């Protein structure tokens, strides 16, 4: 048969190989396309069936490929190539043989593995090369039959459909045999329920539904572990659990129908396995609509007939939201699955899960993880990390804390690093002094030499300790790794029924390694001086939680305890004349940091009442500065912007269907990003009454649901609302007792706000009006800020007492608080200073003295 006529009968794979063989012959300046060119092209093909056959037949692919390349180099080259190549008579003979075999097999197309069979029957140079590299005819023919699986080649893409399970699925039952699955604990009920559904006569397809991170995939891995251990009912023994790789199934599907062909090939192979394969589809909702294009089926619809007939045993896994959004819409697909709800485990169950994973993570990181660290990981993640589920978030905490310790072990200790940098500095200084000849320099050089020697000795001593510690840790990590391998081997020996080997490992090798590990740890503990941490403790877990959330969970240092005990002093340095307010806020912060505050409510919620300019907002700023070392960590919301009813949506986000739904709310987004913050609602009485309805949940439960249905945690915020209500009463009753003044103000407040709102606030605090004595201290604070601004320009400021007293006189107004004083400083001090600075009157490093001569302020 002519080659051109025959080429229409080749499969797509064989056509690609022949095209590649032609390119290879042209590239190497050969006159003809020889069998070597075709075989080389088949070897280089991605997912080549020739490679699979050669491996089954016991050949070494690397050696075969090298031998073929050497044989190609020995072929004669054309001196002046024209770029035209023809198929050689030998190649044509082989292709005719392929056609003959195809007809004998009842194939409609000629597939590439027939070329390999033709090579052996033609008995040419290529056959001798293959035999020389361990590929015997009998083994190759048997491998060809195994790959074909007794099927005829009936379409152009038949080769792509072969081994569909191997290409598009992952064997989950093989993973426990290789020791690659972490132990699954506390999910016996769900695994038993899944097995129960799998044994049903119809609708024997469980779908695991639960929030992200609760362990749906782990349940399937637990089932695979039981199948591998044969700890399952008789009907499930010997079955294979395969996970569908949807990405591989979709990748590279260039033409319409290609995806459907691949999925159909997978389903056909599963059907042929006669119930011995269980297919696991993670994120099963992605099958609804996958591969859908105009006029074609999607993957979900292709699964339905196989599920209905019972040909396909399938386990699905998806989240509650995605099940509702995708699966429930397709009722025909949904009814073929039986739901298994997977709930979030409790903190106690999570601790048990972590204890079982502990050893795996210790082996991976080469460190120790203490039991208190596991308990802390479960408890702290449950309390402080919202928006994620146990056990996933607790495992992540443990993993990151272990990674931090591992990184420290691999790095040079801080004390050695400091000495190293100091030595470099001293050596540079020594090089400079060596060039000097005067007596002072020589004395300094002598002192320097002594210091360098002392530092080098200290560094050498520390390095010796460090290297010994590193060696000890490395030794312990190696023993743990060996123990892990022995345990995997023990399980494999039990499965094989090799009880002699199992007994040797269990009662001989494992106890010996455990004893060795104990001795190593005892030696490490006995070292008097330790440079490195090699254990994850509860403190490391708390550090990671603080880093993730910004919430100070870590154990308080003595310095912080001291600061908290004297918090009033710190706040009073900036907030003058408001002792009651400062005490109330300080007590709330202390309760929280001592762990005594209600964990279901905000740290504190206060309503600050008082006239303008008395320090309500300043106290909030001071508190933010104390808690976070920055005033920027205060979420300030000006409530005068929320005077309309519809403006509530700006706080929590627009509801679905409205413009801005995807942008989130101003308040909820700010707190979601910084859960530990001071939230200030300024001028709260100016807001619409409906705004307070949204705040009721925040004040009582410490949480708020935003427009997108996400719960935002307010339990670690200090909520402060400021108001000018009753400020005229404060002025009128300034001479009366604090309680009398407060009750008069609260009457006005109760008339404006609803009782349920007032009742949820921890404390309503009335700020006093400011007296002249307070104004003097405020003037000092304001001038100190001016002094700091001038320091950046290298200028010093000194203000005489007469000048401060005059500023107080000019800026004192009982109705307006401290703000008139600020304006007086601007007008009488800052404005003249600005003119003088621009005129160049003051040079850097000079001192500006401000006085008062009885009429005007003086500047010297």
From Swiss-Prot:
The keyword RNA-binding does not apply. GO terms for cellular component: cytoplasm. Its main location: cytoplasm. Pfam families: AAA, AAA_2, AAA_lid_9, Clp_N, ClpB_D2-small. Keywords: ATP-binding, Chaperone, Coiled coil, Cytoplasm, Nucleotide-binding, Repeat, Stress response. GO terms for molecular function: ATP binding; ATP hydrolysis activity. GO terms for biological process: cellular response to heat; protein refolding. The keyword ATP-binding applies. Homohexamer. The oligomerization is ATP-dependent. This is Chaperone protein ClpB. It comes from Dichelobacter nodosus (Bacteroides nodosus). The gene is clpB.
